[in-house]
């Protein structure tokens, strides 16, 4: 069954750990950063460290193996069905530009007020979706045939529910995501589709410009 932290979302001050090596390695990294900060870079000295934890990011440029979007793109490009190993697993999906904006906001705040912004920070979406939701959106945006369930009986353990609580970033930095799942997947599909004939650098520049305009529009709407 899901723990209370999983249901409400993992916070920055929750105990570190993990059932599987992958999540345990994330916790170990945070513990190492925290100990280094306390030992050598206390905020009162004017220099310190903050760590950032993003949700499950998607976006163009990822070609790694055993990752959801790249595996699906490779299959769709070959005319196959998009594979889903754990369609019911819930993750905090977000476009890669969302946490990157948060990292820049955190870096700026840390530079001006080290003591106020040291520590760990979560940058996750306001809503979570299943693997199946993401794959179905991708198939629709890519104009492909469909998806298929491809279970791996010998696969390592993975948590079925992962949620991030980003209240701290929202309240102290004014950060929040501006893209919903559909728009995030659409941008991702568009990047992979266009790289067949266009420069990846050109697509990234155009995507970034579009994202900046979306952020500005969102900010203007909140002022009304």
Q: What role is predicted for each listed range?
A:
Residues 45-51, 58, 108, 116-121:
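Glycine-rich, flexible loop segments associated with nucleotide phosphate handling
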Residues 1-56, 63-64:
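Catalytic helix-loop patch of NAD(P)-dependent Rossmann-fold dehydrogenases
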Residues 27-34, 73, 101, 132:
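Conserved active-site helix of classical SDR/Rossmann-fold NAD(P)-dependent CH-OH oxidoreductases
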Residues 1-3, 61, 130-131, 158:
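A short beta-to-alpha transition loop/helix N-cap that caps and shapes the active-site region
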Residues 65-70:
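Amphipathic alpha-helical segments in well-structured domains
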Residues 57-59, 99:
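Conserved sequence/active-site signature of Rossmann-fold short-chain dehydrogenase/reductase
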Residues 11, 39, 76-224:
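C-terminal substrate-binding subdomain of Rossmann-fold SDR/epimerase-dehydratase oxidoreductases
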């Amino acid at each position: 069954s899901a723990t209370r932290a999983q249901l409400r979302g993992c916070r920055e001050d929750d105990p570190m750990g993990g059932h599987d090596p992958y999540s345990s390695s994330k916790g170990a990294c945070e513990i190492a950063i925290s100990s280094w900060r306390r030992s050598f870079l206390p905020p009162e000295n004017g220099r310190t460290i903050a760590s950032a934890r993003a949700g499950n990011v998607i976006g163009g440029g990822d070609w790694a193996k055993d990752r959801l979007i790249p595996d699906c793109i490779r299959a769709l490009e070959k005319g196959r069905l998009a594979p889903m190993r754990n369609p019911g697993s819930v993750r905090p999906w977000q476009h890669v530009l969302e946490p990157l904006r948060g990292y820049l906001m955190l870096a700026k705040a840390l530079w001006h007020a080290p003591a106020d912004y040291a520590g760990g920070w979560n940058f996750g979406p306001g809503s979570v979706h299943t693997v199946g939701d993401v794959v179905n959106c991708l198939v629709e945006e890519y104009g492909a045939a469909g998806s298929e369930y491809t279970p791996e009986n010998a696969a390592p353990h993975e948590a079925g529910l992962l949620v991030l609580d980003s209240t701290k970033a929202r309240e102290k930095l004014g950060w929040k995501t501006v893209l919903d799942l559909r728009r995030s997947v659409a941008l991702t599909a568009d990047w992979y589709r266009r790289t067949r004939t266009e420069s990846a650098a050109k697509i990234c520049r155009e995507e970034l410009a579009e994202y900046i305009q979306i952020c500005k529009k969102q900010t203007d709407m909140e002022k009304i």
